[in-house]
């Protein structure tokens, strides 16, 4: 659907070249929700602007549906942009227009007949749950309602792609969840490809199928959501994941390790999370199991569990218990320098 091939964007600033995006190669499949996460200045917003040619790449090519877009004429670009909807952190609504008028705006630009505009806008108002707000102005709406208007407006011309630029960053947690659920509905019912950028890993966790991590203009890690969360390879990705799955060792656990305690990290996936492996080894081997920390989250409808346990008993029995655990779950001994 969307392909970035060795794409770079360089700006000149104060006589120096600044690489906002550097040699990025990515592929976004049709109908998926693809997240790009990074800290401020990572280059993710620049990458988004390259998709609809608000910025042109310094090097490399970008293709949509196998059509290279960097050499399109002005007329062709105008047609391309009708296929791409966009929502923003700051909503970007016209304060002088009603909710109906905001949603209708791109349809009027496209010279759609009035009766069709009315039908389409009413359909979208119902879709985003704002049927009773058609004649309201943006100042009369909450942040979540404003973003719903933004989503409806982005969908007005029936695009194939929806770009979300920090779409939930200005919202409270409850409203964020509501907007993410609405975006899932958009993806599911309209089969839209959604390209989303954020600095919040919990947003990626809730909605994305795949994710790329950017740092200093480069993609440093990319893959399926479950793989990136459960096996983060880079330090930056690990820090993002820890904002959702806190695997830092508490001081009390570190003290136990330093005093000779045998601490192990157990990770469970899918059906493994429902297996009573700890009670089994406690009953069948002469060991005591002390659970020090644990959590379970859901990633794309698959459970992922993380436990820290201390095993106490004779070394021979502990080794037998460990042998059994290795057959059931992923197991790693935690060392004193771990954090």
Curated annotation (Swiss-Prot):
GO function terms (MF aspect): ABC-type D-methionine transporter activity; ATP binding; ATP hydrolysis activity
Protein's name according to its UniProt entry: Methionine import ATP-binding protein MetN 2
InterPro entries (UniProt xref): AAA+_ATPase, ABC_transporter-like_ATP-bd, ABC_transporter-like_CS, ACT-like_dom_sf, MetN_ABC, MetN_ABC_transporter-like, NIL_domain, P-loop_NTPase
GO CC, any one term: plasma membrane
Function of the molecule: Part of the ABC transporter complex MetNIQ involved in methionine import. Responsible for energy coupling to the transport system.
Keyword ATP-binding: yes
EC number per UniProt: 7.4.2.11
Catalyzed reaction equations: L-methionine(out) + ATP + H2O = L-methionine(in) + ADP + phosphate + H(+); D-methionine(out) + ATP + H2O = D-methionine(in) + ADP + phosphate + H(+)
